[in-house]
């Protein structure tokens, strides 16, 4: 019997990334995959939602940026305090922020085409770093993000960002013989 999967994400950039890149790959395993941005929802409502998802025997992935926490463990502790119904096994920590996952998927050829740096690692890339790298030809950061997603390379992203590699491996998102 298939279930439903809820991917809990912080904001709209996460919705865009998970909706375009991750949801289509997880959909065959579930009756439905829903992406739920939780940052603007009251804590109590998120807690009730997490509890109801578990009671209905559905699955969820709870995604959070590490931001400026010292470690994944520290970030998880903050989430445990904030959301009493959260299951630690369902937490995915993005290092550093979702923008680092976007940028990780840019191949050398695409970086050259866009006129941007081909970073060997995006593990320390912040939202501010990402914004500073947006080429002038794009009207907005959203346009730039859509352009990245058009040619996003899972293989490149798993090499350039450790937390993306860990996520992809854990949920068997992309089958790469090197992972």
Residue ranges with predicted function:
Residues 9-13:
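Acidic donor-binding loop at a coil-to-helix junction in glycosyltransferase catalytic cores
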Residues 4-8:
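Conserved beta-strand elements of the Class I
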Residues 1-2, 15-36, 44-61, 66-179:
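C-terminal accessory helical subdomains adjacent to catalytic cores in phosphodiester-
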């Amino acid at each position: 019997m298939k279930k439903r999967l809820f991917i809990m994400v912080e904001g709209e950039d996460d919705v865009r990334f998970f909706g375009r890149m991750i949801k289509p790959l997880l959909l065959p395993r579930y009756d439905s995959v829903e992406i739920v941005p939780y940052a603007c929802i009251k804590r109590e409502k998120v807690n009730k939602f997490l509890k109801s998802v578990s009671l209905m025997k559905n699955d969820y992935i709870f995604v959070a940026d590490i931001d400026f926490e010292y470690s994944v463990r520290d970030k998880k502790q903050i989430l445990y305090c904030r959301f009493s119904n959260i299951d630690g096994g369902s937490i995915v920590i993005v290092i550093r922020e979702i923008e680092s996952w976007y940028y990780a998927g840019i191949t050398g050829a695409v970086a050259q085409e866009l006129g941007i740096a081909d970073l060997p690692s995006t593990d320390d890339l912040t939202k501010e770093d990402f914004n500073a790298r947006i080429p002038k030809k794009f009207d907005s950061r959203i346009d730039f993000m859509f352009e990245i997603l058009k040619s996003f390379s899972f293989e490149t992203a798993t090499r350039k960002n450790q937390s993306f590699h860990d996520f992809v491996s854990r949920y068997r998102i992309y089958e790469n013989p090197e992972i």
